[in-house]
Structures are given as C-alpha cells and as structure tokens.
Amino acid sequence: MTLDNVNRAAVDRIIRVDHAGEYGANRIYAGQMAVLGRTSVGPVIQKMWDQEKDHLKKFNELMVAFRVRPTILMPFWNVVGFALGAGTALLGKEGAMACTVAVEESIAHHYNNQIRTLMEKDPEKYEELLQVIRKFRDEELEHHDIGLEHDAQLGKCDFKIGHHPKMMPGGQRMLFWQAA
C-alpha cells in the first residue's frame, strides 16, 4: 500500500482513530496496573497491556508512514484512560475485567466496521491495513474473553457500550468522532 493509490481521507481517519484508541487502551491498562499490578491478576493485565503496546507501536509506525497527524485529544485520552483503568481497578479485579470486556468488545466492533469499509473499497489495495486491523481485532477479542474468564460478570459495575452509533452513549460517540 502506497500513498499514491489509497483514499487518503479514509486511511487518515482509520489510522488516527485506531491510534487514539490504542493509546487510550494503553492508558487504561496502565491505570489498572497501578492499582492491581501486585495482585494475582497483575500478570494477566500485564500480558494484555503488552499486546496493546505492540498495537500502539504499529499505529505509531503507520502514522509516520502515511503522514497522519494524531488526534488533538491525546492529552484527554492520557488522563481519562488512566482514570478509567485505575477507577475500575479500585472496584477490584472484577471491576477492571468488566471494563476490559466492555472496552475490548467496543473496539472489536469498531475494527469490524473498518474491515467492512476497506473490503467494500478495494480489499487488494488495502490488504496491508486489513491484515493489521484483523490481527488486532482478534487480539482485542482475546482480551474480551480473558476478562470474562476472570469474572468480569461479577463486577460491581455494569458497562453498556452499544454497537450501533445510535445506541452508543453520546459521550463515547462524541469521542470517536473527535478522535478523527
């Protein structure tokens, strides 16, 4: 995939939004580790965080390769992501895992929408980006399942993140839009 043969607006938006999402996920896991890092679930969170670090590294590389600017909301993602991770971890392992399940489910759904969009445009032209998104989507779904295996359903909080934009909480809809 080269700069010359792609829909720049679509690729810019995908890379910018995914970079912001992976940055936010990294901050969530950082917050969870600050609270639960020395507990029995610490290694589980660390393993998921390590994968998120790889995702962020790849999107950093894609931003440079395709000359995409980051979202203006990076400082916001920094603070809010950490606060969300630490705040849910303060509710215990189950609260942190409930957050993980909700966030990873939402991200996987978002990646699925991007895959559909790129497949409709030209799957051969976007094969490199499609491979990255598919791989990361699959890893996000693994994190979702790990959260369920570690008692997310027993959490003291109930995260509902809708899959359809009209069902998605207004604040989250605005954040996805602003990240682009």
Residue ranges of model-derived segments:
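Non-heme di-metal
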Residues: 1-180
